[in-house]
Design a protein with these regions (language model features):
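Structured, helix-rich domain cores that form ligand/interaction pockets
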Residues: 1-255, 270-299
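Helix-turn-helix DNA-binding segment
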Residues: 257-264
């Protein structure tokens, strides 16, 4: 089951850039498989249930106990890679929920989901999500796509052995929203030594924490996910600036607000496709299913 589910009125001087006579070609819009790739549940263990849950952790054959002390344990279900942590006193001292459960829903069948709910979740109160990873998988090559935001977003790119982009990070791990675009096919090959049949498999993943977990259905409304072709800009100085901005992210910091706005508009103009609209439409189609999946853990 695990492998099956693993196999998505600013100033007028800001004119549109002059592009080459060859028009933007019509692009085939990709399709997306959407899933929650990681969920972290937090809540407070009901005090009278502490012994029952601790005893279960100590005797269940599928659980590897990593640490066990009075009113505290860390454990892992070795079959489905489910992590469970409870710390009564740490939760109290830090004024936060004392129990945490982490898992990848894509790796769980219904029996595993029921195992989590019946043995842990039902003994917790004030349950909420502290992290949700929303994944969009597509067979389109996303190596040359970029995230464009009105706000300043840190970008980090890692290249594969063929010197092509393999993983792109937008934002920081500490932020409430952290975005990854990566070659899922290569990741599967590297980590599982499996070669999938599709020519390409890429993932756009939104790591949402804290308050952003409640906004998962609109978590990229403020972004553009584009594939700019810098060669289309005819004016040499603008073409050179666009190339520099695409390859040296720190150069955005050397521009004033108006200039940033100008070049962000140019990037949008020279991109034949913005994946955001397509992703929003697909998310709307699958939204009820995804809502039910989250609601399962809260009821």
């Amino acid at each position: 089951m695990k492998n099956d589910r693993e196999k998505l009125g600013v100033e007028n001087y800001l004119k549109k850039p002059a592009v080459s006579n060859s028009r933007l070609s019509v692009q085939t819009l990709p399709t997306f498989d959407i899933s929650f790739d990681r969920i972290t549940l937090v809540g407070d263990l009901i005090p009278k249930c502490e012994k029952q849950v601790s005893d279960f952790v100590s005797i269940d054959s599928s659980i590897s106990v990593l640490e066990a002390l009075s009113s505290k344990f860390k454990a892992q279900n070795v079959l489905d890679n489910i992590y469970i942590e409870y710390d009564k006193f740490k939760g109290k001292s830090l004024q936060r929920k004392n129990m945490r459960i982490e898992f990848n829903p894509n790796n769980l069948d219904q029996n595993s989901m029921n195992w989590i709910k019946n043995n842990f979740v039902k003994f917790m109160r004030d349950i909420e999500f502290s992290r949700i990873d929303l994944a969009f998988d597509t067979e389109m090559d996303l190596g040359n796509f970029f995230i464009l935001s009105d706000k300043s977003v840190k970008k980090t790119i890692f290249y594969g052995r063929d010197d092509k982009p393999e993983t792109k990070y937008f934002g920081t791990r500490q932020s409430d929203r952290y975005i990854r675009i990566y070659n899922k096919k290569q990741e599967i090959k590297d980590n599982k030594d499996l070669e999938i049949a599709s020519e390409n498999l890429w993932r756009i993943e939104f790591v949402l924490k804290r308050n952003m977990t409640e906004k998962w259905s609109v978590c990229f409304d403020d972004l553009n996910i584009i594939k700019p072709d810098w060669k289309m800009v005819e004016k040499f100085s603008e073409r050179a600036a666009i190339y520099l901005l695409l390859n040296e992210d720190g150069e955005w910091g050397n521009m004033n607000r108006k200039t940033k706005y100008k070049y962000k508009n140019i990037l949008k103009e020279i991109s034949p496709i913005d994946l955001k609209n397509n992703m929003q439409e697909e998310l709307e189609r699958q939204q009820e299913r995804l809502k039910k999946e989250l609601q399962f853990w809260l009821t």
